[in-house]
Structure formats: C-alpha cells, structure tokens
C-alpha cells in the first residue's frame, strides 16, 4: 500500500507540478505582426486560446487525478481503513493499552483450594483460588483438576514425562469429591481447603496475572 501511495505522489508531481512546455511555448510566442492593428487582435486571440487550453488541461488533469486515486482504492490488497488507522494512531494506542492494563491484576494473597471454592482473583476480602498459576522453577503453567486427587505413587519423573497431557496424567488421578489436584512439571499437590500459597514453602508457584 505504501509503495502504491509513493507511486501516486510521484505521478501527481510529474503530471501536475512541473511546468508544461506547451504552455511556455504559448507564452513566449510573438504577440503579432509588424502592423499596429494586427497586434491587438493577435493578443486577444492568443489570450482566448490560452484560456481555453488552460480550462481544458485543468479538467483533464482533475479527471486523471481522480482516476489515479480510484485505481489505488480499487487494488485488491488496498485497505481503505488504513487511513483511519493512521489518523487515530495515538488514540488507538491508548485504547489498546487500556485492556492490557486491565488484564494485569495479580492475586494477593494467592490461594489454592478444593473444588468447592470458585476460581478467580484472590484478595483478602474475596477468597478465590488462583487459576493463573505458573511455576518459576520449571516455567510451566499449573494445571488443576476438580474433584480429583493425586495417587501417592506419583513422582517427579511421572510429571516430567507426562505434563501437560491429561490423557497421560489421568493414570495417576483418583476421583475425590471436593478435592482439587494441582501440578506443574516439577511439583504437585492435592488441596481440599482454602490455603494461602505462602504457607507451603516448597512450592515455587506464583500468580501469572489475570
């Protein structure tokens, strides 16, 4: 699109901004013969011819300019909305930043819980289980399964080899109403009650922001 606009500007400059040799030739043409009466008549005729030529050229150039603009707009890959994007660049950047900032809320404190507690942004007044947990040790997003608990035979290699595929992990999941099974690639927990994450010093889980 930018290339098309540059070509359009170059063509407009070439056709409409440079002096016309024909017009210069008319301006430099002698204004009449040696006789006094022929001079005034020649001047009037020459002026009328130049005015007519200018009017004709003006309409022709306007039509050519409209045609060039229409050709650009009719290109298959031309995005007509791009001009609006350029005009409202600053306002659009502001509108983009606003929702991003709105999605940058973190739980404080961070809670784990059983399936009876809803998930969401945890605060001191709104005790919800964080569902945007991430492990800073293995850099994995924490998965959780409602109404399940981990089998006691689970070990590090099991999660290392099977995360985050549920069809593989479910071989070590046991149904338990009210429980919630959490796991990353290096740690796992079964939780039934609302628990402050800071109380478990072995876990290196943090809220990944909502």
UniProtKB/Swiss-Prot annotation:
Residues 41-59 have a biased composition (Basic and acidic residues). It is found in: Cytoplasm; Photoreceptor inner segment. Disulfide bonds: none annotated. Transmembrane segments: none annotated. Residues 1-77 are annotated as: Required for interaction with FAM161A. Keywords: Cytoplasm. Pfam families: RMP. One of its GO terms (biological process) is photoreceptor cell morphogenesis. GO terms for cellular component: ciliary base; cytoplasm; cytosol; photoreceptor inner segment. May be involved in photoreceptor outer segment disk morphogenesis. Interacts (via N-terminus) with FAM161A (via central region); the interaction is direct. This is Cilia- and flagella-associated protein 418.
